[in-house]
Amino acid sequence: MSSPDNQGPDDGHENDGPHNDGPHDDWDPGDLTGLEASAQAFTRTVDSLTAEDLAEPSLLPRWTRAHVIAHVALNGLALAAVIDGVVHDNPVAMYESDEQRDADIEELSGAEPSELRERHLAATTAFADAVALMDENHWAGRIDRLPDGPAWSMVTVVPTRRRELEIHHVDLGTSYTRSEWPEDFVVELLNAVTVDQASSGPFEVRATDVGRSWYVGGEGGPNVMGTGADLGWWLTGRGDGEGLSSDADELPSLGPWRRASATIGS
């Protein structure tokens, strides 16, 4: 069972105006400030869920809330193991195979709520500890999702992990919604998804609440307007564009997220 892809290259920073910039000079790829806040919010929600709540469907097809939490925990542990491998010059892939990944999620989703919570907390700690070992040379490396790829840049690891937490937090279908995403995360998300979005043609998205714009698939084409959170939700393949408007007759059609060299699968 697979969740929708919701990862892509993160550009770290954007100046005002419609473009997709790379990281600025003083951007620290190991800064965990935003990630820690996202992890704490996710943990509070996990702590609030009963066994009955965990068995309820999530917003993702065929997945319960327990499946989502299991995936987030195992993703964090996998990333921590990969980082540790890079630091100790013993590289490993995140997952042996997609089939094994899915089987592990299925198994953990059936665990007792206490074990599910413990694995999530262990993943949070392991990831932070692994990142703390990184130096400048390590950040220049790349990571494989599977033994035969795809590979992506190490500098995307922290923002990618944060996207896992924030997007899947909403996927749990609890009281936490995309409208609660922090503004810095919304900008980070739009930096990522506009770069990696395969679409039917070029268009521009304008986040009315943050006053910024991004091109998707090149310059030109219609404008799509809405809050940054609504735009990010739509561009990750979630929802039908509720809350968005366009100067065209309808919203542009979206293709699947590409698994390009700089993207990371869930």
Where do the protein language model's features map onto the residues?
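A short, structured beta-strand-centered segment in the mid-to-C-terminal lobe
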Residues: 101-123
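Structured surface interface patches that mediate subunit assembly and partner/cofactor docking
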Residues: 2-8, 21-30, 84-88, 133-266
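A structural signal for well-ordered alpha-helical segments within the folded catalytic domains
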Residues: 36, 40, 66, 73, ...
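Structural signal for well-ordered, non-membrane alpha-helices
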Residues: 43, 47, 76-80, 121-135, ...
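Helix-loop segments that flank and shape redox-cofactor active sites
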Residues: 43-64, 90, 133-150
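Hydrophobic packing residues in well-ordered alpha-helices of helical domains and bundles
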Residues: 32-35, 113-120, 158-161
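Basic, Lys/Arg-rich alpha-helical nucleic-acid-recognition elements, primarily the DNA-binding modules
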Residues: 1-12, 16-17, 21-62, 67-70
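Conserved alpha-helical segments that form or flank metal/cofactor-binding pockets of metalloenzymes
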Residues: 66-97
